[in-house]
Amino acid sequence: GYHFPRRGLGGIKRSAPRAQEYGSFYRGYVSFTAAKPSKSRFDHNPSVFLLINSEDEDGDEVLLSGGLYMPSSRQLKAIRERIAANPAPFEALFRSKPFARSFPDGFSTERIATRPPRGFDREHPYLHWLKLQGFFVWRSYRRKEYTAVDFFDRVACDARQILRLNELLENAIAGR
């Protein structure tokens, strides 16, 4: 199952040189990452990431994301091959009402290649997914949302949708 690796818990205390640089011993944010243990030190498993940043100037002080942000080349190729061969499970996930309500934009286009990946059809109907270099979704919560009584239920619902995506990614990587 999922666990919080030691590196996955963002510390709030800064080192002495950083404290001098930023003027405070404490960071204005804290982050948590949960993932299944990886069998390889080069591959990372899909994860769930939560960031709470009190100093965010855009008002997106709480961020929830999940999926595979920086897949290894082996993982990237496996996911692309799965999408090229059978995009139906991903399409069904993104079309499902709970997932679409949580992540209406689908995969993030933050990390996308300019050209189609080598070995894939330039006319593939899901080329926009094949060009992705990271397979993750994210959403931010405004102050009105994260101060609401039902905020924890909302985050739990969104995290369950991320786990559905992570299962698809894990299956693609494992060749199942």
Model-identified regions with their sequence ranges:
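A contiguous pocket-lining binding segment that forms or flanks enzyme active sites
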Residues: 66-118
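A generic structural signal for short, non-catalytic loop/turn and secondary-structure boundary residues
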Residues: 2-5, 25-27, 43, 59, ...
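A residue-level signal for beta-strand positions that form part of recognition/binding surfaces
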Residues: 9, 29, 134
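Aromatic- and glycine-enriched beta-alpha-beta binding-site module
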Residues: 18-85
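Long, solvent-exposed, polar/charged low-complexity segments
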Residues: 104-176
